């Protein structure tokens, strides 16, 4: 029988972020975003794959029934003190496994590379804070760093809804209750979990992912009723985030929703992880701190992406920072290369970045003189 534990430990010891297991391929590790084969064993056979499926489901008929019905399965797994989030899906009717390795240490806010204004926003008594980005952009890390920070500094009840639970928090100054979302788990859906949260006397609600109208509906209601709500969305910028929220609703309802969003939204932190000069990944964020001007833009009948971006650019003294400014700062500080920075932009963006870098270098020279 294939030694799956050996494969998992090999990936963990090599510092992989993900382990990919597919029929007729050797196990593949993602290390600093580079896919690398595990050469110590031969290609995996159909029998190997089925043995691995048996290993992860461990005779649990509930898990097997869920997989047979949904054709996908998410589960948590622990080995030698390390935690993994395992996704099982199908390819040509054969299971495919993707295991995300979760670091055992809770992320610290001070290590994120985010400005202190984000920490201050997270200490607000009520409102909506969104952490956004595409897959593998570090959203869960930021979310859990904020939970960890609040847990150690404030006397609050924090309720989290996650699918699955990645980092396990112990109550410190705050009381933390973590719930896993999914059929047969702590609550069946994010929206159901949020509705029940209204009866659980929580101060802060953390939503692992907002991806449908039902969830954003009750999240907005929760924020409006005096709670702090922190959630994630799969969007790459503040303007796209607002568009996504409004897109959940019919046109006839959007004006009402705009007013609600403009009144409860406090910040959008949109982040990307970019290959750094030290073979690491560097977080480059866009941060929109919502003030009266940005609230007014959200309430407009129509607003453009450029209006939101310009508002962010001109409100740096309030703590906002545009993506292009974050890129420029990362290049100037030599954390990322100019080549990697330009890969994130279109032609117009590259021109703006070059102009901004020239201005920053000129100011630096003038300060020396």
Residue positions per predicted region:
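Short, flexible helix-loop junctions that flank or precede catalytic/ligand sites
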Residues: 1-369
